[in-house]
């Protein structure tokens, strides 16, 4: 379970404040206009930004000022976080083995996760030689492999074709439910998000509307959300 309480962050003249609770296995779509605070929220949760005030609790433990490496949270940005000088295998297995050992066990793990993201390429190939969509799938594979308690996906599949996006959304949903992972997905592709969840956080002007999860039908009653859809 994750609890965010009066989490405040200020950048120049812009202020953000977040309040909400999420349970294990919750899959939540995070919606809002560009600049509303979606990426800011993810960076605060992951520890890449330090808040000016407030608290973040994960399973009852306060993690507000822990380093990113000390949090049981995995994050995937729209711009993939790959190491271009490393191979596909090394980039993926790095998620669970910092030494990147080419054991039979590790090779099997990487091949299996590559199948899940429809990546049918020589795993010894350098990531720098891949297309943008292929590089994104490498990032997704590494992220899925880590199986952290919290999974943050920031516009994760936008560069991929609709068929693969649908498959990956299904994989994320299955993995989240099976492993009791709390998953937040930021995306403008609302119709696709609705295929995996009816739980949403809508960020408007730096704050979460009603400070809680709302269903899509509940959001439709909100004036700001209606304007967002136009």
Model-derived regions: residue spans:
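ABC ATPase NBD coupling module
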Residues: 62-77, 98
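Catalytic Walker B motif of ABC-type/P-loop ATPase nucleotide-binding domains
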Residues: 151-155
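Conserved ABC ATPase "signature" region
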Residues: 104-122, 174
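Conserved ABC ATPase signature
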Residues: 126-130, 134
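Helix N-cap at the start of a conserved alpha-helix in ABC-type nucleotide-binding domains
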Residues: 162-164
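Conserved beta-strand-loop-alpha-helix hinge in the C-terminal portion
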Residues: 207-229
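Helix-to-loop junction immediately C-terminal to a conserved catalytic motif
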Residues: 46
């Amino acid at each position: 379970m994750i609890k965010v309480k009066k989490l405040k962050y200020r950048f120049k003249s812009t202020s953000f404040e977040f309040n909400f609770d999420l349970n294990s296995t919750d899959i939540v779509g995070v919606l809002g206009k560009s600049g509303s605070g979606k990426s800011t929220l993810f960076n605060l949760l992951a520890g890449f930004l330090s808040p000016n005030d407030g608290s973040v609790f994960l399973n009852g433990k306060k993690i507000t000022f822990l380093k990113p490496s000390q949090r049981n949270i995995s994050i995937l940005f729209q711009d993939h976080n790959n190491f271009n000088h490393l191979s596909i295998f090394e980039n993926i297995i790095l998620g669970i083995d910092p030494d990147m050992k080419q054991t039979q066990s590790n090779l099997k793990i990487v091949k299996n996760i590559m199948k899940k993201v429809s990546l049918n390429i020589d795993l010894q190939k350098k990531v720098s030689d891949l297309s943008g969509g292929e590089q994104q799938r490498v990032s997704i594979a590494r992220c899925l492999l880590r199986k952290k308690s919290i999974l943050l996906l920031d516009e994760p599949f936008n560069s991929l074709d609709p068929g693969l996006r649908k498959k990956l959304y299904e994989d994320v949903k299955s993995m989240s439910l099976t492993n009791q992972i709390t998953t937040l997905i930021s995306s403008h592709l609302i119709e696709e998000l609705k295929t995996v969840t009816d739980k949403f956080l809508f960020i408007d002007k730096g704050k979460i509307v009603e400070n809680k999860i709302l269903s899509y039908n509940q959001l439709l009653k909100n004036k700001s959300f209606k304007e967002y859809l136009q």
